[in-house]
Amino acid sequence: MELVSIITPSYKSERFIAECIESVLSQTYENWEMIIVDDCSTDNSNEIIEMYCKKDARIKLIQLEHNSGPAVARNTAIKEAKGRFIAFLDADDLWVKEKLQKQIAFMLENDIAFSFSEYVKIDEHSQVISEVIHRPKKVDYKRMLKSNYIPCLTVIYDSAKLSKVYMPLILKRQDYALWLRILKKVDFAYCYNEPLAKYRFYSGSLSSNKFVAAMYVWKLYREIEKLSLAKALYYFVNYVIISFIKYKK
C-alpha cells in the first residue's frame, strides 16, 4: 500500500479544521500522512491541530514564521512530503471515507499520473447544497486554459511519475496554475466519475469572489503561462463564458 501525503494549508480554520481532519481519519485507505501547514493563524486552529497530532502520529503540523499565503503553505508541505502520491485537501473541505482507496486504485490500475474526481458543495453547516458537480472524463493543457475543471480538494498526483511539482507563488488561482504546470508534463488529467469530496462554499471563502478570481486568471495567462496577448484574450473570453454558464446552472 503506497503512502499518500495529504497537503493541507491552514489559516484561521478553527471552525472547520476538526471536521476536515476527521474526514481523513475515517479513510478506508490507512497508509497516509497529513501535513498541515499553518500560515500564522491568530485563532485556536493550532491548538485543535496539535490535539490531533498527539492522538495520531500520521498528522503533522508545521507553523510558518511569517504569513505567506496558501501557495507557500502548500509548497512547504509538498517539500516535507514522504509519500509517492500527493493529495490536496483544504482546511474547510471534506473527503468521503472511500476517497483515497478508490482514487489510488483508479490511478494504479490505469497507469494514471494525475487524477481528480467529481464532488458536491456543502455550506458552513456541512449540509449538501448542490447536486453532484460532474467533470470531464479527461482534460489536457489547452482545454484547461479555457476553464479550471479540476477542483483542488479532489486532486492526487503521482510523484514517482512526475517528481514533486510545486505551486507558483501567487495569491489566488495557484492551484489552477499548478494543474497547468502538471499538464505540461502529462497528456491528460483523468477524472474518477464519482463524488469523492465535499467542497465548502460560504461567504468569506477565497473562492466566493468570482470577479477577483477572473482577474487573477488573466494575470496567470500573461505572467505565469506567458501567453501572447491574442492567445490570452482567446482563452480569457472562453474562461468568462464557461464561468458564466456554470454560474447560471
Question: Where do the protein language model's features map onto the residues?
Answer:
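Acidic helix N-cap motif at the loop->helix transition within catalytic regions
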Residues: 16-18, 43-51, 94, 98
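A conserved acidic beta->alpha catalytic loop
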Residues: 23, 30, 38-47, 66-68, ...
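Glycine-rich, basic loop-to-helix element that forms the pyrophosphate-binding segment
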Residues: 64-81, 102
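Short aromatic/hydrophobic "clamp" motif used to bind/position activated sugar donors
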Residues: 86
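N-proximal low-complexity "stem/linker" segments adjacent to membrane-targeting elements
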Residues: 1-25
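Conserved donor NDP-sugar-binding/catalytic core segment of glycosyltransferases
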Residues: 98-129
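Short loop->beta transition adjacent to catalytic acidic/histidine clusters or analogous donor-positioning motifs
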Residues: 2-4, 25-36, 44, 57-60
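Conserved nucleotide-sugar donor-binding catalytic segment
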Residues: 79, 131-216, 220
